[in-house]
Amino acid sequence: MAIVSYHDLVYTEVLIIIPPGTSRHYPDPALTNLGFQQNQQVGSDYRDLYINPSPPKQILGISKDKYLSSQIYASAPAEQVHLNAATAFLQGLYPPLDEKTASETINNGSTIPAPLDGSQIPVIRAEDSNSPSSIWINGAKQCPGITRSQQQLSHNSTYTDKVDSTRSFYEQFWPLLRNVSDYEHKSNLSYENAYDIFDLINVGLIHNDSIRDAVTGENLLQLRTLADTHEFDRASNFHAHPNGRIDAISARTLSAAIISRINQTITSNGTNKFSLLSGGYEPMLAFFRLHDLTTPSPDFYGLPEYASTLTFGLFTEEDVTTFPDADEDLKIRFVFRNGSNPDRTLTAFPLFGKNEISLPWTEFLYEMSQLSTDTAGEWCKICNPSQKQKPLCSSFRSSYYTSSDSYDHGHGHKGISNAASGVVGAVVMLGILTAAAGGAFLFLRRRWERTGPVGSLLGTGVPRKGGIRSLTMSIGSERVRV
């Protein structure tokens, strides 16, 4: 197993999974003290790696001690558990300032100490479910197309066989859950609710002494394994629809968000140093499947542990003092850390069916954009929610939907409207340039200057994407710890 290092990391992006809190079975799950500590520990570990004096992988020009909102971007759904998880991470990344640094001196000579013992309060964008930006972190939420697809999955013979074969296993937990809403009837204890049952019992084992002796380690492992399988199948049921756009939607919108944040760093010459997206496990699982990460490691079939992180590092292997040239010097590496335990290291994995764990930025951008849904209008077209389900989509219906341009759930046909013509034109341009370069996209020297349609996440400096390509990939198996 090779050990890889590089000189100046100029950007890194992180996605946090839901931390250990109250069970998601109940409305408005909350972050527990344990969850806050775990996310704070992960933030502290990232600080040691990227920010502290003489770190192993330095983020170029980042503030060492004082949190600067101009350098750090953070976004989360407008839900308590996600916002608090992001806060905990960032307070680990930037711990309380010492008294001297935090104090201020005013004109009369008085020294004013900082409140909260110097704790730094990060700025986090709370994405309301009615905001166009809400789809990027979890594109599956309020997407009725997902519900229809998952209903198809529930009629699959393999799925129904699993429900039948595990029924007696689940029903043994009825004495524990009979007083929990939705489980008053034993019949609801089944594989169909695999994650919810695992979540209730797992959280209970952490916080409730009364059930510790009622669930064996073997039982918990089986509950976890069944939840792994159930949720992975739901997140990656790409064959329920011919081109898989619906079932991969959360991974595709997440891919667009990643492109957008990295591109923001490049177009600003590194002003934005670090971006944090706080979300749940569902887009993670879909991302693993969409980008075929299960081939280099079967661990990606399972649910990520609490406070797991995906990281996309934009870096250069050259010794630099100013922001590098995007076309020639910048590379991307994807790394994953499963959970918050200090012994869990960031591990690099290849993407897009390639063997290399580091790709030129332009190549990464091209590959990633093939598998992204980068406008709210496109999301609305794929998911086709009612105005009540997603009011924001009403603004796209007149320009993006026509009677002949509706999304055909039977054949996966996607018509071309005026609002999408900019995308199609750019696709043709991209195809011509790629062919002219002999397929060597990474050698292109010109930066693309094209503004996307209404609701575009990519903005300027990003080539528009092509059509949805086949998901039959072969990926290298090299795994590198960094």
Where are these predicted regions, by residue range?
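Signature for phosphate-centric chemistry
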Residues: 2-71, 77-275, 281-482
